[in-house]
Amino acid sequence: MMETSDLRLTRIPIKHGTGQMPALGFGTLIPDAALTIAATKDALEAGFRHFDCAERYRNEREVGTALQAVLAAGGVTREEVFITTKLWNSNHRPERVGAAFEASLERLQLSYLDLYLIHTPFAFQPGENQDPRDENGNVIYDRGVTLLETWRAMENLVDRGTSGTSDRDKSNRGKCRAIGLSDITLEALKPLYESARIKPAVVQVESHPYLPETELLEYCKANGIVFLAFAPLCHGMKPGLLEDPVIVAIAARVGKTPAQVLLAWAVQRGTALLTTPRSAARARENFDISVLPEDALDEINRIQTRQRLNQVVKTGVPGFIPKGG
């Protein structure tokens, strides 16, 4: 991690790739097109320089519109901004990876991506339908491709000048600076890491004090992988972390909001994070974090509640696990 006394400026070096990831990231999972554009601009204005996108979110074009408007206005350069997007489950077949990457680049109006992630380890029936279902409403998985085969195609995006792939794949080379995985367990990550020619640069998973993922975090640190936490505020679900007595008490003591306390904790433990403020005021709040004292970090680490909110690690299908699940 790049040492700085200002947590807002923390950048984490990409060891299995190039560049540095700003620890404070803006997640673009916003269903409304107009709100996506406005919120992305607000986040840039607040100071966010890390943006996490996905084919699945169906709003890459709007994110690109907002980003290009801000870049054109000056004050922010493309080199300052770290952009991630993700390969969706229905494009896991190796022959589909290059086209999916190229389509995301076009929608985002970019000449390169800082990071391209496999959105989940689960392959769905290949095709344009992002959510293929059978007559009983069950997801149709693709049993004809392995995660490692998809990873090899991801590696090809990073490579330069290797023969034996399609012209489309060759044209993408140099446009993908790093690759990684999202919604993966430690058990699934280990064998892929061992087999990978180009190691995963980043692993993105749900993580917060109710789901610290300590073992996965330590594995990532030991192997030069950036740990990127989504849902660091538990999606704002109530009752939840924002109302947790420990977090509320620390916030009052240090003069910050509960959200700011949770985001500072995430950065200070060595992770990057994603948050999705949908207003300018919330973007400014979420960006305005500062160092927590050691006793506050210890109190948060001692929280015993354990809860996973998102079931995607089990099925590849986005959604929330009901309480008690």
Which residue ranges define each predicted feature?
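Short, acidic/polar
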Residues: 31-44, 93-108, 185-189, 212
